[in-house]
Amino acid sequence: MKRTALILGMACVVLAGGSAARGEDKAIQPTEKIVLFDGKSFDGWVRHVRGGGDVEKTWTVKDGVLACTGRPPGYIRTAKSYKNYVFHVEYRWAGKTGNNGILVHMVGQDRVWPKSLECQGMYRNQGDYFEIGGVEFNEHKIKGHRARGRRVAKYGQHNEKKPGEWGVYEVWCVGGTVRPYVNGKLMNEATDCSLTEGKICLQSEGAPIEFRNIYVAPADKKPWPVVPTKKIELFNGKDLDGWVRFIPNDKPDKDKKWTVDKVWSVTDGVIHCTGKPHGYIRTCESYANYKLHVEWRWADKPTNSGVLLHRAGIDRVWPKCVEAQLMHQNAGDFWIIGGATLKHAGTVKKGHAAKKNPSNEKAPGQWNNYDIVCDGGKVALTINGLLQNEGTDADPSSGPICLQSEGSAIEFRNVYLEPLDK
């Protein structure tokens, strides 16, 4: 009996110890701001460099600043894991610019490039992603002009400050979504990430860089979907900054020109779309509760197009969304696509939901106005001043807005959002 009791007692100790170990490894979800760098020491951090080198030569702390020489390659990481947070860091190049990165959801053993999702810190490339160690996410899976090798390029122009000036890099990690913001501008989005928690690393990768004011905070007040409080120009009249171009199987030709470059272009304040092959441009940002204004005209024989509201999931030709139809003579119809739903005339619909009145589109070559109101789950479509369709209980009710390529040449201009109360 005594031997049995002793064995049982030891088993309880082992189990308790195992539980404690698992508890220590459990990812922290911040409920308040957690300061990660105290400005004086490396408390709460683990340093790692290639070949087991002298970390004291790579990383130092002085005057409230965490300084990195950039050599040899490696990183400094949090000792603890985190999930569902916003990571905040201020940074500046201490001399010559170069390469760096923020690794989120780092798991596994310490090595120079551990399994993680890198939010690129390279000069003029901040906001790119690098997949490290087999991390999967939607935007990497679809390949195309933005996804080359392990890299997924940022949305558009950089938003970095001049070398020597302090910039702000924030990374929002919410569930399977990762969003990097550089000086307040959304630079990219990774969705359905295979990793949703882990340690956070600041890289040493080539050039001297300094960090300060490092913390994580709760992600309960995420900055998306954006609800307009003033007019938002979605199209700047000059280029497609703020938009993502999508064509399936997007490939470069012999002149290294990608398919999306042939389908979409901008001249004289107008977005031109060839209509073939099928695809769309979509806003980088997600929106909810707004008035959308779009002007369109057929540049050739009129065929088909549409405004896709609140695209959800992975980019594909017909994603989950509510389509405000632009097919010639059918503008104002709804098409509910990809598993989306909408209540129309009292019935939950999937597929087609016809407009109320005969077509009031203008002749091909003339500009038309599309005014769309999205208010919670309510959606109303007005063509050239005439209310053509209404629906309620839309799912999804927020997300990016897309303009389709689906048939023949079409043009768009004056694309903007306004608040509902205007």
Residues of each region from the PLM?
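Positively charged n-region of N-terminal signal peptides that target proteins for export
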Residues: 1-4
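Carbohydrate-interacting regions of secretory-pathway proteins
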Residues: 20-422
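Bacterial N-terminal signal peptides
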Residues: 7-16
